[in-house]
A protein has these predicted regions:
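Small beta-barrel nucleic-acid-binding modules, primarily SNase/OB-fold domains
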Residues: 1-139
Length: 139
Protein backbone atom coordinates (compact mmCIF):
# COMPACT_ATOMS: atom_id res chain seq x y z
CA UNK A 1 0.00 0.00 0.00
CA UNK A 2 1.43 3.35 -1.04
CA UNK A 3 1.20 5.89 1.79
CA UNK A 4 -0.98 8.99 1.52
CA UNK A 5 1.10 12.10 0.83
CA UNK A 6 0.39 15.48 2.43
CA UNK A 7 1.41 18.23 0.03
CA UNK A 8 0.88 21.82 -1.07
CA UNK A 9 -0.54 22.34 -4.56
CA UNK A 10 1.81 24.78 -6.29
CA UNK A 11 0.64 24.49 -9.90
CA UNK A 12 -2.27 23.47 -12.10
CA UNK A 13 -1.44 22.44 -15.68
CA UNK A 14 -5.00 21.66 -16.77
CA UNK A 15 -8.26 20.24 -15.43
CA UNK A 16 -6.74 16.94 -14.33
CA UNK A 17 -3.03 17.61 -13.64
CA UNK A 18 -1.44 19.30 -10.61
CA UNK A 19 2.06 20.05 -9.40
CA UNK A 20 2.58 19.51 -5.68
CA UNK A 21 5.34 20.11 -3.18
CA UNK A 22 5.48 17.53 -0.41
CA UNK A 23 7.51 17.83 2.77
CA UNK A 24 11.07 16.63 2.22
CA UNK A 25 10.49 16.08 -1.49
CA UNK A 26 10.88 17.78 -4.84
CA UNK A 27 7.94 19.02 -6.90
CA UNK A 28 5.84 16.20 -8.34
CA UNK A 29 3.28 16.05 -11.13
CA UNK A 30 -0.01 14.45 -10.11
CA UNK A 31 -2.58 13.17 -12.62
CA UNK A 32 -6.07 12.93 -11.12
CA UNK A 33 -7.19 9.32 -11.40
CA UNK A 34 -10.36 8.08 -13.06
CA UNK A 35 -11.20 11.39 -14.77
CA UNK A 36 -10.21 13.03 -18.04
CA UNK A 37 -10.65 16.78 -18.41
CA UNK A 38 -11.06 18.58 -21.74
CA UNK A 39 -7.81 19.45 -23.49
CA UNK A 40 -6.73 23.10 -23.42
CA UNK A 41 -7.92 23.71 -26.99
CA UNK A 42 -11.27 22.00 -26.44
CA UNK A 43 -14.38 23.84 -25.26
CA UNK A 44 -14.27 24.03 -21.46
CA UNK A 45 -10.52 23.24 -21.38
CA UNK A 46 -9.59 26.55 -19.76
CA UNK A 47 -12.67 26.54 -17.52
CA UNK A 48 -11.78 23.06 -16.30
CA UNK A 49 -8.29 24.29 -15.38
CA UNK A 50 -9.79 27.29 -13.55
CA UNK A 51 -12.16 25.00 -11.68
CA UNK A 52 -9.31 22.80 -10.44
CA UNK A 53 -7.21 25.88 -9.63
CA UNK A 54 -9.96 27.45 -7.51
CA UNK A 55 -10.37 24.17 -5.66
CA UNK A 56 -6.73 23.26 -5.07
CA UNK A 57 -4.11 25.90 -5.94
CA UNK A 58 -2.05 27.00 -2.93
CA UNK A 59 -4.03 24.62 -0.71
CA UNK A 60 -3.01 21.58 1.28
CA UNK A 61 -3.86 18.31 -0.40
CA UNK A 62 -3.97 14.65 0.52
CA UNK A 63 -2.62 12.63 -2.37
CA UNK A 64 -3.75 8.99 -2.49
CA UNK A 65 -1.43 7.41 -5.10
CA UNK A 66 -2.79 4.56 -7.22
CA UNK A 67 -0.17 4.17 -9.96
CA UNK A 68 2.35 5.93 -12.20
CA UNK A 69 1.48 6.76 -15.80
CA UNK A 70 3.69 6.47 -18.87
CA UNK A 71 4.80 10.10 -18.40
CA UNK A 72 6.09 9.42 -14.86
CA UNK A 73 3.24 11.26 -13.15
CA UNK A 74 1.66 9.85 -10.01
CA UNK A 75 -1.96 8.92 -10.73
CA UNK A 76 -4.00 9.63 -7.61
CA UNK A 77 -7.20 10.62 -5.88
CA UNK A 78 -6.64 14.15 -4.58
CA UNK A 79 -8.39 15.73 -1.61
CA UNK A 80 -7.97 19.53 -1.44
CA UNK A 81 -9.15 21.13 1.80
CA UNK A 82 -11.46 18.17 2.42
CA UNK A 83 -12.94 18.15 -1.11
CA UNK A 84 -12.38 15.15 -3.41
CA UNK A 85 -11.10 17.04 -6.48
CA UNK A 86 -11.57 14.08 -8.83
CA UNK A 87 -15.24 13.76 -7.88
CA UNK A 88 -15.84 17.52 -7.78
CA UNK A 89 -14.50 18.02 -11.33
CA UNK A 90 -17.06 15.45 -12.52
CA UNK A 91 -19.83 17.06 -10.42
CA UNK A 92 -19.09 20.51 -11.90
CA UNK A 93 -19.12 19.14 -15.46
CA UNK A 94 -15.43 19.95 -15.84
CA UNK A 95 -14.25 16.40 -16.63
CA UNK A 96 -15.45 13.06 -17.93
CA UNK A 97 -15.30 9.76 -16.08
CA UNK A 98 -12.31 8.10 -17.78
CA UNK A 99 -13.96 4.85 -18.91
CA UNK A 100 -10.68 3.09 -19.58
CA UNK A 101 -9.34 3.60 -16.04
CA UNK A 102 -12.37 4.07 -13.76
CA UNK A 103 -12.53 1.98 -10.58
CA UNK A 104 -15.05 4.03 -8.56
CA UNK A 105 -18.34 3.26 -10.30
CA UNK A 106 -20.17 5.93 -8.25
CA UNK A 107 -18.49 8.54 -10.47
CA UNK A 108 -20.89 7.54 -13.26
CA UNK A 109 -23.98 8.57 -11.27
CA UNK A 110 -22.29 11.90 -10.45
CA UNK A 111 -21.55 12.39 -14.16
CA UNK A 112 -25.13 11.49 -15.10
CA UNK A 113 -26.47 14.16 -12.71
CA UNK A 114 -24.09 16.77 -14.17
CA UNK A 115 -25.16 15.78 -17.69
CA UNK A 116 -28.88 15.93 -16.81
CA UNK A 117 -28.50 19.45 -15.38
CA UNK A 118 -26.24 20.53 -18.29
CA UNK A 119 -23.39 21.59 -16.02
CA UNK A 120 -20.10 22.64 -17.57
CA UNK A 121 -19.16 20.73 -20.69
CA UNK A 122 -22.61 19.11 -20.72
CA UNK A 123 -24.06 22.46 -21.85
CA UNK A 124 -22.71 21.58 -25.33
CA UNK A 125 -25.01 19.49 -27.51
CA UNK A 126 -22.30 17.01 -28.49
CA UNK A 127 -19.25 17.36 -26.24
CA UNK A 128 -16.23 15.43 -27.51
CA UNK A 129 -14.52 13.08 -25.07
CA UNK A 130 -10.91 14.19 -24.48
CA UNK A 131 -9.47 10.80 -25.48
CA UNK A 132 -11.36 11.01 -28.81
CA UNK A 133 -10.20 14.60 -29.30
CA UNK A 134 -6.57 13.55 -28.72
CA UNK A 135 -6.91 10.65 -31.15
CA UNK A 136 -8.19 13.02 -33.86
CA UNK A 137 -5.57 15.71 -33.18
CA UNK A 138 -2.30 13.78 -33.02
CA UNK A 139 0.72 15.86 -33.92
Amino acid sequence: MIPILLCLVVGVADGDTLTVLCKGSEKMKIRLSEIDAPEKRQPFGSRSKLSLSSMCLQKKAKIKPQAKDRYGRIVARVICDGVDANEEQIKRGMAWVYDKYVKDQSLYSIQNKARASKKGLWADNKPIKPWEYRRGNKR
